C-alpha cells in the first residue's frame, strides 16, 4: 500500500549538515531525499543516469567539461551515466535524486582538470 509523504516535513526533521536516504522505490529505481550544506566528492555513475530535483535552497552541480549548473527550487537536471560531477551548496539545500537502485558510485580521487 502506498503512503503519502510530505517531503519538506521530512527534510525539516534532519538536523545533520548532510543526510541522504531513500524515501521510495519506483520499479527498479530509488528516490532519495538529500539535505545538505557543503560539497560532495567528484564522482560518476557508470551504470545509471541521475535526476536531481531541487525542493529548497540552491544546488550547484560542477562538471569536468562544462559550466556549473545552478538549480533553485523546482529546477531539475538529468545527468547522463558516466558524467563526472559533484554537488555543492552554500545554503541548506533539499533535493530529490532519482537513480537505479543498484547504481554504482565511483569516487574520483583528484579533482578533474
Curated annotation (Swiss-Prot):
Gene Ontology terms, MF aspect: manganese ion binding
Domain of life: Bacteria
Domain Cupin type-2 residues, every copy: 41-88
Pfam family of the protein (one): Cupin_2
Record-stated family: Belongs to the SchB/CurC family.
PANTHER family xrefs: 16.7 KDA PROTEIN IN WHIE LOCUS
Name the UniProt record assigns to this protein: Uncharacterized protein YdbB
Source species: Bacillus subtilis (strain 168)
